[in-house]
């Protein structure tokens, strides 16, 4: 009787979301749907961003493009890494044992998310320097220093999470879709505090400090410009139109950055601290907060890139190039279509 019961339990796959399991399909349906959906979204979104940067050379003239492309590649690798738990949930055999697979997956995703988060902080620092020191900006921020900064971001992110292989504790809940990670690999309060103090807290403080000061400086500049325009209009006797306040645009960017960052990451960080300090875990909470934070891999480049008019033009060129290639292929297959001798407009990628 006991052996039969054990056999029935062992036939059921391990599911963090127990209510997502269906007997008919014999896998964790809800987990698979969520992870596969986010994987497709992250991969496709960041591939588009990378292609647009290759399609619009003007984007590469901006220093922030170095960090945005770093974010795009890091987030793309996050999406590719998420294929591993997707295949595991669909009962595909793992190349190595489950314990090593989930440790490597948790470490890789943690490092990639750290690179993405550090790039966000570096973008805010770059914009802060551009506004506070516009005359010396080109001498302070050089391509060589940007490449060095990106290298240090990857190195620092790797070093922060490397102790997870030396029994310091679990770096996060990314690998908890594997049973060994969820049940046998536990968090440590000291290692969790170390990660928060070395990564999450500094990144949040830098973003808040820099964008708050950017907003304040731009608001002061707008006020000065409005006063000068009013003084000039009163002296000339003409009522000139006051230009639209540019601080509104900065306020919206500030709102998007801070709100998305905290909405997606704060629940994960809070649960990470509470679970490691109290020892009480909740599988539903860990899954929800973890994949909510991972979804930021899709939001990062969307927030920064879609706010750029040059990026939007590059996206139009990319879509135009795809339509042109489809049209030219259709024309080549149709012998009755008159072919134009002029060059095709589009983006050569």
UniProtKB/Swiss-Prot annotation:
Its main location: membrane. GO terms for molecular function: G protein-coupled receptor activity. Residues 1-32, 97-104, 169-191, 274-283 are extracellular. It is a multi-pass membrane protein. Gene3D superfamilies: Rhodopsin 7-helix transmembrane proteins. Residues 54-75, 126-147, 213-252, 305-349 are cytoplasmic. The chain crosses the membrane at residues 33-53, 76-96, 105-125, 148-168, 192-212, 253-273, 284-304. Glycans are attached at residues 2, 8. It comes from the Eukaryota. This is Probable G-protein coupled receptor 21. The gene is GPR21.
